[in-house]
Amino acid sequence: MTQDQLKQAVAQAAVDHILPKLNDRSIVGVGTGSTANFFIDLLAKHKGFFDGAVASSEATAERLKQHGIPVYDLNSVSELEFYVDGADEANKHLELIKGGGAALTREKIVAAVAKTFICIADGSKLVEQLGAFPLPVEVIPMARSHVARELVKLGGDPVYRDGVVTDNGNVILDVHNLMIGFAPELEGKINDIVGVVSNGLFAMRPADLLLLGTQDGVQTLTR
């Protein structure tokens, strides 16, 4: 199967997993990126079975609306049963690197609210150690140079993602060459840097369920 076919298969597995648990009051959290887009397109076929969705980015909100799925502000939602999103890297502890699409902060907020965080990815995203994929860090623009210097002290090589402005009006530094050992500790250290909004390590709140699309079918990992 091609990579797109693997993404579609794992997106279908996520739909199949949540559908029996949805009702006409259910609101689904939806992530951002190519795999999440497959999930949206497949979920839309069942839009009569749930109330609507919370989007982790403006792009996702637009895609949901195009399918006729109501999009809710997270502040108006009292309960979020599921959040489904992709990842740039994942390990066996279901800790993730996310943010290749620059939506990491809103993704992290929705994941924090959801009872169950389901990560969907093709099998190539499963790694022994996180960090080969550059770690995105969302930064207040005026703090960019300061944050970059602090990230160097942590052993990284930050690169400004030129021309990218997040939905929150901030900029992204992609941190290369980080050897990520204990991911929750590093996530906290980076978040403590003044000027950092959030970073793409999802380790303090990892996924609850990881669905991996492989040539042998969809594999399931849980915490």
UniProtKB/Swiss-Prot annotation:
Indicate the secretion signal residues.
none
Fetch the CDD domains from UniProt: RPI_A
Query: GO molecular function of the protein, one example?
Result: ribose-5-phosphate isomerase activity
Q: Does the keyword Cell membrane apply?
A: no
Its Enzyme Commission number(s) read 5.3.1.6
Gene Ontology biological-process entries? D-ribose metabolic process; pentose-phosphate shunt, non-oxidative branch
Q: Which GO terms describe its cellular component?
A: cytosol
Q: What class of enzyme is it?
A: isomerase
- Pathway assignment: Carbohydrate degradation; pentose phosphate pathway; D-ribose 5-phosphate from D-ribulose 5-phosphate (non-oxidative stage): step 1/1
**One Pfam family linked to the record:** Rib_5-P_isom_A
Q: Where are the transmembrane segments?
A: none
Listed A to Z, the keywords are: Isomerase
- Catalytic reactions of this protein: aldehydo-D-ribose 5-phosphate = D-ribulose 5-phosphate
Domain of life, per UniProt, equals Bacteria
Q: Where is the active site?
A: E107 (proton acceptor)
Q: Where does substrate bind?
A: T32, G33, S34, T35, D85, G86, A87, D88, K98, G99, G100, G101, K125
Matching InterPro entries: NagB/RpiA_transferase-like, Ribose5P_isomerase_typA_subgr, Ribose5P_isomerase_type_A
Please verify whether the record's keywords include Isomerase.
Answer: yes
Regarding protein family, the annotation reads: Belongs to the ribose 5-phosphate isomerase family.
Summarize the subunit comment. Homodimer.
Q: Which HAMAP family match?
A: Rib_5P_isom_A
Note the PANTHER family from the entry.
RIBOSE-5-PHOSPHATE ISOMERASE (PTHR11934:SF0)
Report the function annotation for this chain: Catalyzes the reversible conversion of ribose-5-phosphate to ribulose 5-phosphate.
What is the protein name given in its UniProt record? Ribose-5-phosphate isomerase A
Organism source for this protein? Answer: Stutzerimonas stutzeri (strain A1501)
* Record lineage: Bacteria, Pseudomonadati, Pseudomonadota, Gammaproteobacteria, Pseudomonadales
